[in-house]
């Protein structure tokens, strides 16, 4: 039934139109409102941190990609739809029982433009939005330069493969998508309007449909020819020979590469055959051409390389792959900076030839041996330096060094941060959580080579106040008293790893002019944030935006928010760097330092590539577990540089990026893309540079590669006989590899303390020590790697063997049984240290933690014993084991009396300190070490003593120690009141 005049479209009543309009508006608000809020908040935040130009550049790049891809895809699809519609047959039988698409055809005919433009624009916008994620490739292509290194196969600069080729491939992929979508759109349109009919029993195709479909099919095949051409260059990153090596091998060069050229020619001929369908009605020629292309891809592109690999290459792989392995070695060394310009190799016997006390370098090394393990002591720091239930330290503490009174000392460091997860009761109220408990308080450090006192009584070790760190605290209280070993002028921490764990992560600071401070500072004082960081929410519009973003109406109605209020967001240092520099990959371990009286976080950042020709692939990131439980490997890269050192101010969140590698062409490209965002290396303050550490993530990648790529000769590389392995962690039962460790050791030239990141390496599928790798962190030699290579037939034990030898020692085993009655045992870092002019000293701290059955009691680790071990010089692989409450005593056990004298003495007197948790004062604070400008002088060497006499002396010393222990207990009992 019709209403109104014939040909007139029905008109909705005004009320219905208003409802439809309102409904559409609400739908649009629900769909796009949250995204618009996020965009506005990002605009404010990037402006606050001073990196709005980055946000604008990325946004404009992505919008340009969306526009370009949408225009191309929509244009090609719309052209296909328009041509198919205009060339439709004039007469199409409209019988629903014989034509199932008749109803759809009628609907389209009523709104042909709506359907045509709607489909084309929708497909174009969707493709554009997906393509916008390739903005990195676009920027690298536009601003990329040269490396000054050419590939060994084609003779092109490396810049072509890493800057240009990925962009060309991306453009080609989207042209593929556009043409395939156009082909499908044309096919469906012709079918809808009768140009292609399948209901007549044998099918029917109009001339217009045949021509149009042939053109699009030919275009697809022509694009495939271009893809084959680009495939030639991507062979240089082939994974065919992995895990042996990466890059084009013999089969790739002598079979795959010619095959690609053959397939290019066949694809071009096939495309021409499709285009002939424009003039010829016979479709058998294009069909045969398509069959030829498929058959050629199988035979020429697949079977031929497979046969060559199986019957020609594999039987002679060591010889035929030799030049390609050489290419892989050279490219990998260049891509990861593990070549001769950056790595120094030295032969090392693995057996000591001198007493450590006679070697100045060893005197320094022993004096700086680290006994505190940052992986174990976080709970100890928290329990002894927490102050309040809502303060905490990171799960893993950090290691850094400071020069106090001229003496370089390494410290275990941590920041006393606010822990949002620790707030309880009324502390979790919105006002308290976000406006009162807003910041942490203080920088806490402990000398890494000493504790307050030695823990001696094994039976009552958990009841003693021994084996704890000696803290150097720089917080609000110490600022007022002027007692700071490491001076900090602003100890408040608004940005950190722990504080950012709030969900949602934000704090509201500031307030109305003249209002009283409300942020918790100490038990007797409040504070008002005065930093430059933070997004203003002093106006109602911004308050409304943030109320919408965090879904919290109290933003609008709270009287605590005034005209000067700010909201602090994105408080994780690593996240802040990632957001302002999205082209960088950040290290997983930011660490706090004190520079010019302020606490700042240092974040190591890397430039990476995944298409460096012939370079081995590796991952800077560990495996990632998805919410569904699927474990995926981290992003694979084939080039990495620690080109940027970033800092984040812990008080106001200021982010600063410093160039740290002037020779990195990738960083130079990004600095052209985002001018002014990265400061030059000349602007790095000396005080900040002194705290730069060689990053762990990079070192772990380099040591795993050096396990293979220290080999120069391709044939030896192929046999893997000379390979090394990263040792398993002997203190971890999860089959994890041993983490590298930061240590202060004596420098070979000056004997001064040198801060390094080091790792032992064992033989391939063996447990004996094969090498020792260390990376310099001192400004003068930063980045240099030193590799000590042991003989291939060495019997020097590796970490796992040493661990087994130490814990199976009769003294260790018997006392461990005693300790385990009431304690949990934690083994600390097993440190490997070059010593004794050719030997290796292993040092491992042993921590105990009282076992408690009460849920309200708190327990935390304390240093109880020190294990040391060295190879016995006069035996085939035998070892000496030292086990004592102090490092000095352990060293005397393995090297003889006198060596322990050069070890750092304990830092305090256990008799004068109250037990932890007893309500007394905190453990003793650190005192500056004595000032020295030269390494400690080695004590004079005594006469050589026969082994039998040494054994007798050790027994006598043990008896004397037992007598002294009984005497000390008697004196303590006599001095105790009432005793």
UniProtKB/Swiss-Prot annotation:
Superkingdom of origin: Bacteria
Q: Name the residue ranges with Pro residues bias.
A: 913-946
Name the membrane topology term: Multi-pass membrane protein
Spans through the membrane: 19-39, 63-83, 114-134, 174-194, 211-231, 260-280, 288-308
Which keywords describe this protein according to UniProt? Cell membrane, Membrane, Transmembrane, Transmembrane helix
Enumerate the residue ranges of region (Disordered): 898-948
Write down the InterPro entries for this protein, in alphabetical order.
UPF0182 (IPR005372)
Cellular localisation: Cell membrane
Principal localization reads: membrane
Q: Can you list the GO cellular component terms from the UniProt entry?
A: extracellular region; plasma membrane
Question: Which Pfam families has this protein been placed in?
Answer: UPF0182
The protein's matches in HAMAP family, at most eight in alphabetical order, are given as: UPF0182
Q: Which PANTHER family does UniProt cross-reference here?
A: UPF0182 PROTEIN SLL1060
Q: What is this protein called?
A: UPF0182 protein MRA_0066
Q: What is the species of this protein?
A: Mycobacterium tuberculosis (strain ATCC 25177 / H37Ra)
